[in-house]
């Protein structure tokens, strides 16, 4: 992982884990993963902005199944009209990539699952906030 983004240090994983299940015919259209403040569990409840000093900059996908066909993650370096780069992630692997306003963000998409069921977990790598990292956030948010 990148130790610094915009001069801000990595501070760990977001406590907000999202679980996804893709069945045959399911897909995820081209999109931009959002950049979010760090979450934490406080008194048994998820608090969305628990710290005030960190934002996510990288997506992490954890692959929990391998007995499916299709469902590759595709990245579009030149936008949706350009050529896609397909990435097959086998069972037990992790895929990490920049999101939000990060200058190296390439919009991802999830190919249609043809057979079987694809299970993944998504979370984020959190980074501190600096004037440079704030510029990265503003490019995405506004």
Specify the residue positions occupied by each region the protein language model found.
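Fe(II)/2-oxoglutarate oxygenase catalytic core
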Residues: 1-94, 101-142
